[in-house]
From Swiss-Prot:
Top-rank taxon, per record: Bacteria
Source organism per UniProt: Escherichia coli
One Gene Ontology MF term: toxic substance binding
InterPro entries: Colicin_E_sf, Colicin_pyocin
Pfam families hit by this protein: Colicin_Pyocin (PF01320)
Keyword terms: Bacteriocin immunity, Plasmid
Protein name, per record: Colicin-E8 immunity protein
Amino acid sequence: MELKNSISDYTETEFKKIIEDIINCEGDEKKQDDNLEHFISVTEHPSGSDLIYYPEGNNDGSPEAVIKEIKEWRAANGKSGFKQG
C-alpha cells in the first residue's frame, strides 16, 4: 500500500492494514521501519509506537483498539480524523 501524507487521507480500514502489517512484521526490514515511522508521524500521538507495542488502559493492542485510541486522542486535541468512506 502506498503511504499517504496525512491521517485524513486514510479510511480507518486502510490505516488498520498498516497497523496489521506492523503487528505481523509484514515485508522486509526497510518496509517495517517505514511503516512504523509513518505510523508515528501521521498519528501525532505522544505515545507513538507504544500504542502498538506497550498498550495501556483499555487499549489491548489490537488494531481496532489502537485506532479507537488514535481517534479519541485526535478529537480531544482538535486534530483531523480519518477520511470517511
